[in-house]
Swiss-Prot record:
Residues annotated for Mn(2+) binding in this entry: 388, 390, 532
Gene: N
Gene3D superfamilies for this protein: Arenaviral nucleoprotein, C-terminal domain (3.30.420.410), Arenavirus nucleocapsid protein, head domain (1.10.150.550)
UniProt name for this protein: Nucleoprotein
Free-text domain note: The N-terminal region is important for the cap-binding activity while the C-terminal region contains the 3'-5' exoribonuclease activity. A CCHE zinc binding site is present in the C-terminal region and may thus contribute to the substrate binding and/or the specificity of the exonuclease activity.
Pfam families, A to Z: Arena_ncap_C (PF17290), Arena_nucleocap (PF00843)
Family, per entry: Belongs to the arenaviridae nucleocapsid protein family.
Binding site for Zn(2+): 398, 505, 508, 528
Organism annotation: Mobala mammarenavirus (isolate Rat/Central African Republic/Acar 3080/1983) (MOBV)
Keyword RNA-binding in annotation: yes
InterPro entries assigned: Nucleocapsid_arenaviridae, Nucleocapsid_C_arenaviridae, Nucleocapsid_C_sf, Nucleocapsid_N_arenaviridae
Keyword terms: Capsid protein, Helical capsid protein, Host cytoplasm, Host-virus interaction, Hydrolase, Inhibition of host IKBKE by virus, Inhibition of host innate immune response by virus, Inhibition of host RLR pathway by virus, Interferon antiviral system evasion, Manganese, Metal-binding, Ribonucleoprotein, RNA-binding, Viral immunoevasion, Viral nucleoprotein, Virion, Zinc
């Protein structure tokens, strides 16, 4: 981290301390009391065993059960703990603008945390390989034609950490550090007097009042307090447990021992003051320009306090035991924007044109955009890729992108702007009901086309409209190959494709007719962008033997939420 980033981050911390000083409490006595309780009641042979499990190359459900059992014992022995609390934030102490900011920032934070804790794309090996092994694996995969694969980022010690468990939700809230537990472990496992440990961590906390203690500071303090030599200077990896001796854990413990220091670690949140605390946090956000960072990894001070306060809302968010809490911050905090409609009087679907007035986002949210980017990593930039659209180049209503080599496809819809022209196209081409498009996700066309790999080559049956669409979205770098099949040839396998893959699309509900050269009309099969791609591929191969199609986008991305109420 650069010095400017460190200074800015600490500026945020200092500003938050000043603004939230009225919510700080004296926790020194209770932290020491809880540490004594842990020293007398905790089985430190099991603590040592848990520390061993955290060093294993593979951790499974049995390891998680042992960790959760020990965490429950710790929870039963301490008094500083946070309680399960569902928070509903409404207009009051917080204005409607405040609520919108909180909703947006929690949404961004959710996306960041999810990106930090999961691989960038499906199918990535998440075992405990060293970075050297992962680099060799990448070379080998490229050798066998799987060059699109990506490797997850490594942890601070060169090991990719992973829990191989059936229910990942059981991992939530099981890894935070607690000052009382840090004190107890340093005392027992370092064979030091509790009073010496308290003095050492208090001095570390005093340094923290002026700066973030670093390894150089730790080394100097170790000359006076040898127990600090147990502190591990390596950066903590994700999901490694609260029983480690990290510098962050020691600094947090030191801060909790400073009565009167206005340390964020001593803040106590209750259902009565949570709105006021968040109001103060937003005041600091505006004054010093705090924000939720796009970069996955450690949380900055604003992200940290926002997450911790919204996780429980009842207790000491930084230092209390929270292993009994289920869910994440966005699960336990609801932002009520006051835009709910009575579901009993539910009318026809709301058009995207009026969705903004009903409280809907005009485009993709931050978390949706992050999900879209992650999902589109499944697209192989070098593979043969079909593209087809329904509607006009300047007003498309259905777009499909399909890769026959792996079966991956992107398929979504768009509400038209020219309803009169749409009805003509529906009658003679696609047969889509405009009301079925009112719940489609606005902004998805631009987002998908923007995130297609650079200089990609797309194959199509008819190039003019697709070229215009791509150019309108600034994607002149994408090249097009027009197969230019005769109409009858292109639709050679139409009935077989519809028989086999009709379940992939249910939007083409209308009757479509075709004008005959000698007059009159004939009913024909509607044109579906996705199924057209499948039949074009079947025609070029003269075979129906194709890879099972697999959607890249989730349904939640293709269709917007049915209610404007934001649940975080």
């Amino acid at each position: 981290m650069s010095n400017s980033k460190e200074i800015k981050s600490f500026l945020w911390t200092q500003s938050l301390r000043r603004e939230l000083s009225g919510f700080c409490t004296n926790t020194r006595v209770q932290v020491i009391k809880d540490a004594q309780s842990l020293l007398h009641g905790l089985d430190f042979s099991e603590v040592s065993n848990i520390q061993r499990l955290m060093r294993k190359e593979k951790r499974d459900d049995s390891d998680l059960k042992r960790l959760r059992d020990l965490n429950q014992t710790v929870n039963n022995l301490v008094e500083l703990k946070s309680s399960q609390q569902k928070n509903t934030l409404r207009v009051g102490a917080l204005t409607s603008d405040d609520l919108l900011v909180l909703a947006a920032d929690l949404d961004r934070l959710k996306a960041k945390v999810n990106r930090s804790e999961r691989p960038l794309t499906g199918g990535v090996y998440m075992g405990n390989l060293t970075q050297q092994q992962l680099d060799q694996r990448k070379i080998l995969l490229q050798l066998v034609g799987m060059g699109g694969s990506r490797v997850p980022p490594r942890g601070g010690d060169g090991i990719v950490r992973v829990w191989d468990v059936r229910n990942p939700d059981l991992l939530n809230n099981q890894f935070g550090t607690m000052p009382s537990l840090t004190l107890a472990c340093l005392c027992k496992q370092g064979q030091e007097d509790l009073s010496d440990v308290v003095k050492a961590l208090t001095d570390l906390g005093l340094v923290y009042t002026a700066k973030y203690p670093n390894l150089s500071d730790l080394d100097k303090l170790t000359h006076t307090h040898p127990v600090l030599g147990l502190i591990d200077g390596n950066k903590s990896a994700i999901n490694i447990s609260g029983y480690n001796f990290s510098l962050n854990a020691a600094v947090k413990a030191g801060a909790s021992l400073l009565d009167g220091g206005n340390m964020l670690e001593t803040i106590k949140v209750t259902p009565k003051n949570i709105d006021t605390i968040l109001k103060c946090v937003l005041k600091v956000k505006r004054s010093v320009g705090m924000f939720v960072s796009d970069t996955p990894g450690e949380r900055n001070p604003y992200e940290n306090i926002l997450y911790k306060i919204c996780l429980s809302g009842d207790g000491w968010p930084y230092i209390a035991c929270r292993t009994s809490i289920s869910g994440r911050a966005w699960d336990n905090t609801e932002v009520d924007l006051g835009t709910n409609k009575d579901p009993i009087n539910k009318g026809p679907p709301t058009s995207n044109k009026t969705a903004g007035a009903a409280g809907f986002n005009a485009g993709l949210t931050y978390s949706q955009m992050m999900e879209l980017k992650d999902s589109m990593l499944q697209i192989d930039p070098t593979a043969k890729t079909w593209v087809d659209i329904e509607g006009r180049a300047d007003d498309p209503v259905e777009i499909a992108i399909y890769q026959p080599s792996n079966g991956h496809y992107i398929h979504f819809y768009r509400e038209p702007t020219d309803i009169k022209q749409f009805r003509q196209d529906a009658k003679y081409s696609h047969g889509i009901d405009v009301q079925d498009l009112f719940t489609t996700q606005p902004g998805l066309t631009s987002a998908v086309l923007e995130n297609l790999p650079k200089n990609m080559v797309l194959t199509c049956q008819g190039v003019e409209d697709i070229r215009k669409l791509l150019d309108s979205q600034g994607r002149k770098d994408i090249k097009l190959i027009d197969v230019s099949m005769q109409k009858a040839d292109a639709r050679k396998f139409e009935h077989q494709i519809w028989d086999e893959y009709k379940h992939l699309c249910s939007m083409h509900t209308g009757i479509v007719v075709e004008k005959k050269k000698r007059g009159g009309k004939e009913e024909i099969t509607p044109h579906c962008a996705l199924l057209d791609c499948l039949m074009f591929e079947a025609t070029t191969r003269n075979s129906l033997d194709i890879v099972i199609p697999r959607p890249v986008l989730s349904k939640d991305l293709v269709f917007r939420s049915a209610t404007p109420k934001v649940i975080l």
